[in-house]
């Protein structure tokens, strides 16, 4: 039995499987944080002593399904994030590029900076710092099967549709209502077609799912819980710090009990 030959075959199989699912994370962090306020952008705001965006990046760094990370940020912040990634051991970052005038343009800039190997793109909000590596992986695996999948959470409150004057028009069946979050993961070729079709037609959407939907493609919903919030106001910081503190406590207790986490 030729061990070297068998090892070579196994490596080739592993490489082939990786090529089919090579996933590039595009982290959108170029916003001006107008609703957040303050002198620094929310991505730079410290959360448990660490800039908010670092928490987000660590989740994608630790997700086995993610092969590279492209950060899209403000041009003047690029050196800052280069240093932070080095300081915090975030090694999957391949490029840090400047954003565009809109979120769609920023994500498109990130798309063009991904590796030629990229087969899937996982588009994430830099401000969703409570996403976990396990949730990222679950959404990615759904996308590998359906070519499009998104983190989401079922609505638990009664949902009302209102008119422009602030009066209820109708009540929606909440069993069919989901709140979309990120990551939103797509086959790279599919998302590229969706993004450039939207650009050509002047379509502006509030999330990347809508661009893919506009092509007539279905997007699989993956329940990721209510904690996957997007930090929007300073009040959200307190909520996020509470969640992170609780997770740290649970991790410490598990380690003390001899359970690896």
Where are these regions (language model features)?
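Active-site nucleotide-sugar/metal-binding loop of Leloir-type enzymes
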Residues: 105-120
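N-terminal glycine-rich phosphate-binding loop and ensuing alpha1 helix
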Residues: 9, 13-78
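Residue-level signal for inorganic ion chemistry
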Residues: 27, 53, 110, 125, ...
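Short aromatic/basic micro-patch
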Residues: 46, 130, 185, 230-231
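SAM-dependent methyltransferases
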Residues: 1-26, 30, 62, 207-209, ...
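Acidic helix N-cap motif at the loop->helix transition within catalytic regions
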Residues: 79-84
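Conserved donor nucleotide-binding strand/loop of the catalytic core
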Residues: 88-101
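Conserved core of the sugar-phosphate nucleotidyltransferase
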Residues: 130-222, 259-261
């Amino acid at each position: 039995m030729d061990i070297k030959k068998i090892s070579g075959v196994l490596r080739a199989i592993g490489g082939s499987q990786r090529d089919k699912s090579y996933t590039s994370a595009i982290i959108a962090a170029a916003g001006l944080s107008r609703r957040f306020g303050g002198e620094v952008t929310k991505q730079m705001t410290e959360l448990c002593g660490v800039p908010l965006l670092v928490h987000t990046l660590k989740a994608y760094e630790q997700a086995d399904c993610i092969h590279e990370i492209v950060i899209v940020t403000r041009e003047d912040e690029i050196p800052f994030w280069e240093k932070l990634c080095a300081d915090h051991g975030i090694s999957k970052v391949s490029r840090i590029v400047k954003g565009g005038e809109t979120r769609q343009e920023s994500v498109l800039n990130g798309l063009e900076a991904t590796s030629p190997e990229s087969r899937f793109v996982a588009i994430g909000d830099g401000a969703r710092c409570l996403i976990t590596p396990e949730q990222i992986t679950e959404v990615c695996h759904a996308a590998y099967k359906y070519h499009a999948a998104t983190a989401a959470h079922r609505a638990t409150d009664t949902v009302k549709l209102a008119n422009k004057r602030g009066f209820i028009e109708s009540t929606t069946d909440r069993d069919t209502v989901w709140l979309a979050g990120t990551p939103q993961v797509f086959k790279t070729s599919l998302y590229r077609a969706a993004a450039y079709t939207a650009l050509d037609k002047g379509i502006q959407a509030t999330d990347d799912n809508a661009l893919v939907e506009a092509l007539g493609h279905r997007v699989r919903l993956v329940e990721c819980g209510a904690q996957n919030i997007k930090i929007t106001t300073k009040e959200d910081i307190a909520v996020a710090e509470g969640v992170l503190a609780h997770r740290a406590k649970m991790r410490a207790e598990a380690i003390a009990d001899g359970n690896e986490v």
